[in-house]
């Protein structure tokens, strides 16, 4: 059985997005743009962007140094 808020909240969000936001957003956006005038993310000209050094880790992200075996046996 699905809880009531799991049904009601998405419906209310859809109603807001479809009918209320076109009227509310133009009224609120000038105030928001005054509060946050700058862009949140600034691009950098880093040439190494996207290159990752994976030499110290195994394919699943575990370090390669030391034992990597995980036993399923319960130890007392």
Curated annotation (Swiss-Prot):
Its main location: endoplasmic reticulum. InterPro entries: UPF0729_C18orf32-like (IPR026776). Residues 46-56 have a biased composition (Basic and acidic residues). Residues 45-76 are annotated as: Disordered. Pfam families: DUF4512. Keywords: Endoplasmic reticulum, Lipid droplet. Residues 1-37 are annotated as: Necessary for its localzation to the endoplasmic reticulum and lipid droplets. Interacts with DERL1 and AMFR. This is UPF0729 protein C18orf32 homolog.
């Amino acid at each position: 059985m699905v809880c009531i808020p799991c049904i009601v909240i998405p419906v209310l969000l859809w109603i807001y997005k479809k009918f209320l936001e076109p009227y509310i957003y133009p009224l609120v956006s000038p105030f928001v743009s005054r509060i946050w005038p700058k862009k949140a993310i600034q691009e950098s000209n880093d040439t190494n962007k996207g290159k990752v050094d994976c030499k110290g880790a195994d394919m699943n992200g575990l370090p390669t140094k030391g034992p990597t075996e995980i036993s399923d046996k319960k130890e007392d």
